[in-house]
Amino acid sequence: MQNDFIIALAWPEGMVSACGSWYDVFFAKNKKYRVGHSALVLVESVTGNLRYFDFGRYHTPKDFGRVRDVKTDGDVTIKTIAKIEKNQITNLKEILLEIKKKESFHGEGTLYASILNDVSYSKAYKYAKKIQKNGLIPYGPFVYNGTNCSRFVASVMRSSSPTYIKNARLKFPICVSPSPKRNVGIANANFYRVTEKAFIEVKRNWFESYFKSIERS
């Protein structure tokens, strides 16, 4: 029975340095992209344990990235334990506020988050660790055998055995490549907006979740 969760995270406002690829001349502005950052938290329903994963150019050679979790980077630990009742995370606000305040996650601006329900923690964890064991991985959204933060998050969510429709949307996003905002929108129509002063739940219908950006909802 799959009754675990994945919390999809997005900081869309962050600026990322261009990686020196052929497409930079078309999309980068002043050698920067406004693509933000994407990450995820695996939630094990039995124990309430939380495991953060992301992918990025953290102390790596140029054009390469790596997968982070608590085993490789102790400062990405999440101390809060998830409280789960009736297949719902009841202390989500506490979890997201801890994430929002933690500088080691490298998130800039407003944090957006949503919950992917009824998935397999063990499958997602094994897949993320498998990618991590590859060590240095070519960085970029269109690089052969490479990845970036959004592609990594989408692939881990797919590995957790979500519903057929969500798996298809993650594999074939409307945009050219997975994005932080799109990952949050696919995981769940409803999402959370977290700032320094506010924690807001935004509820959307099926149509809005497909065609309306979380920043405009």
Regions found by a protein language model. Give the residues of each.
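An almost-null, non-specific background feature
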Residues: 16-18, 42-44, 59-64, 101, ...
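Extracellular-facing segments of soluble proteins and assemblies that are Gly/Ser/Thr-biased and enriched
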Residues: 78-130, 134, 138
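Glycine-rich catalytic cores of cysteine/serine-nucleophile enzymes that process amide/ester linkages
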Residues: 4-101
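Activation targets extended, charge/polar-rich intrinsically disordered C-terminal tails
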Residues: 112-116, 125-217
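N-terminal, helix-rich and Lys/Arg-enriched segments in bacterial and organellar proteins
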Residues: 11, 20, 36, 116-120, ...
